[in-house]
A protein has these predicted regions:
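Outer-membrane beta-barrel biogenesis signature
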Residues: 21-101, 178, 184, 322-339
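Outer-membrane beta-barrel domain signature
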Residues: 57, 67-71, 109-115, 155-158, ...
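Residues on the lipid-exposed face of transmembrane beta-strands in outer-membrane beta-barrel proteins
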Residues: 68-71, 82, 122-126, 136, ...
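Residues that define the transmembrane beta-barrel architecture of outer-membrane proteins
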Residues: 74-76, 116-120, 159-165, 181, ...
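Repeated loop/turn-to-beta-strand initiation elements of outer-membrane beta-barrel proteins
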Residues: 78, 131-134, 167, 176-180, ...
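Transmembrane beta-barrel strands of outer-membrane/channel proteins
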Residues: 80-86, 136-140, 185-191, 235-241, ...
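Outer membrane beta-barrel transmembrane domains
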Residues: 93, 97-103, 252-374
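Outer-membrane pore/translocation modules
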Residues: 139-247, 298-306
Length: 374
């Protein structure tokens, strides 16, 4: 985990230096040419819309250059959002080595071949002050896992339902005078609203198919944000720490996640992004007495942990960037409606993963998010 966090922070620092240098060169070239709007290369947006014209400083961070779900410097503002995630898992690993279904069936009478998970997440955020943001998020899961037994019979296991509610405060603990660098302290609690009792054919489905955890969780974290007129970068670390066991005598393993990213605004309405996303998750502590660990790898509590590093690539669309309710760009009903809306699409592919297997490996993930700040 330390290697992932260190790698993320190193990447963020490198991107910060490169991005700042590129932005300074663009501003210098613009000054030489005598351009009054101080427009950056590849973007149609002028500094006057997003920056303080008198002081030359950023009034607030451009939300179009932030990852999905981050909101800062907007006292009295609300944000609502929706995110769809589709994750595909195909094949199994033991450590970093592939293991075939036929090999797994020598250890267990049943083996998973592949799995898909769809998550629909709804989010609402409110900023009572410029430093404090409060948010609530709740997901809905649809999971489907294809299985085969030693006799060659194929069957499908399914698990659907509402997941655990997350309540998260976020506090701005540091920012530079020009507001180009910010440090946010994350906290929160996970409320066990998701079910751990889902059944199929009269039998309880496996741990990974249940939509909930059954336990209260702590959600600490730390986020760094950096931004210029056309570039942004950052890194964060978040953890899910389970408190105690649920009423089926187990608790899911703690999870630790870190990521680093860089974004570039190409036009006034389009930005691209890339980054690294690392995760470490632990094995299950305890065991559900209704799940036989000898039946399949997904019922063994000791075959659930692992770690993974993904590469991500994304696009962000902002139809009316930097309006924030002001004139002249928000002078009509249509532009007022579009102001604050944002659509993001991100794909992830694993670079490396090591699993306490046999365990299904991730093949790819796609995230589609919409948010509206008003």
């Amino acid at each position: 985990m330390k290697r992932i966090v260190t790698l993320s922070l190193m990447l963020a620092a490198t991107l910060s230096l490169k991005s700042a240098s590129a932005d300074e060169m663009a501003m210098s070239n613009s000054a030489v040419s005598g351009a009054s709007d101080t427009k950056q290369m590849g973007t149609a947006e002028s500094r006057s819309e997003c920056d303080d014209m008198n002081a030359g400083e950023m009034v607030m961070m451009n939300s179009c250059l932030m990852p999905f779900g981050i909101m800062t410097g907007e006292a009295g503002k609300w944000m609502v959002g929706y995110q769809f995630m589709h994750e595909k898992m195909d094949g199994s690993l033991v450590g970093t080595d592939d293991i075939s279904v036929s090999q797994i069936l020598k250890q267990f009478p049943n083996a998973p071949t592949d799995m898909t998970m769809d998550m629909h997440m709804w989010m609402i955020m409110y900023a009572p002050t410029a430093r404090l943001t409060l948010s609530a998020m709740i997901p809905y899961f649809r999971k489907e896992m294809n299985m085969v037994d030693v006799d060659g019979n194929h069957f499908v296991m399914r698990g659907n339902g509402i997941g655990d509610l997350e309540l998260r405060p976020e506090y701005l603990i540091f920012q530079t005078a020009d507001k180009r660098h910010q440090l946010l302290l994350n906290g929160g609690i996970g409320v066990p609203t998701g079910s751990i009792d889902e059944e199929m054919g009269g039998f309880r489905v496996d741990y990974c198919m249940q939509p909930g955890s059954g336990t209260v969780s702590l959600l600490p974290g730390l986020t760094y944000l950096g931004q210029t007129t056309t570039w942004s970068w950052g890194a964060d670390f978040k953890a899910t720490v389970r408190l105690g066991r649920n009423n089926h005598n187990y608790r899911l393993g703690n999870r630790y996640e870190s990521r680093a990213w860089v974004m570039r605004q190409l036009t006034s309405w389009l930005a691209i992004s890339t980054g690294l996303n690392g995760a470490v998750w632990e094995n299950i502590e305890g065991a559900d007495p209704d799940l036989d660990p000898m039946m399949e790898q997904t019922t063994d509590p000791n075959l659930q942990g692992g770690k993974r590093l993904d590469a991500s690539f994304g696009l962000t669309f902002c139809p009316m960037p930097c309006c924030h309710g002001g004139s002249p760009c928000c002078s009509t009903a249509v532009t007022k409606f579009l102001d604050g809306q944002q659509l993001s699409v991100e794909g992830r592919v694993p670079i490396i993963q090591s699993l306490d297997g046999p365990q299904l490996e991730n093949s790819w993930t796609i995230n589609i998010g919409w948010q509206w700040m008003f």
